Amino acid sequence: MRTKLWTLGLCCLLLLCPSLDAKDKKKHYEPLFGKAQASYSVTSSSLKGAVFYLVSGHGGPDPGCIGHYQGKELHEDEYAYDIILRLGRELLRRGAKVYFIIQDKKDGIRETAILNNSKRETCMGKPIPLNQVARLRQRCEAINGLYRKDKSNY
């Protein structure tokens, strides 16, 4: 619960704080955001040098909590993924380096209230295992591998 509140607080802070030090006029592209949102500009260097490893949780064979709204099923993993993409986009716009550990090459940032479930999510291109411990291990190994590559930059 604290992690969710912290993530929500960080999202609010990033969205409410004005951008500073706009320096990079170049357009950047992240296809995971979807066609409409893939292009973005770095508007600040306030997070330059910071590295974030964003994991939306669940995904693949695990939809998380399932609720019902207006006769439709709502799957937690779809909303968590959408929020992580939005957070990641804001971090990138502020000059951070961002790794999206759970990925869905088709969904992207969606502008609808009801997000359809999919099981296409991967862990950085690899299928997500059904076993919960194997899923956690896979994500830890992905993050640790990325950290080892970037470690010299810290």
Where are these regions (language model features)?
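Catalytic-site microenvironment of enzymes
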Residues: 2-154
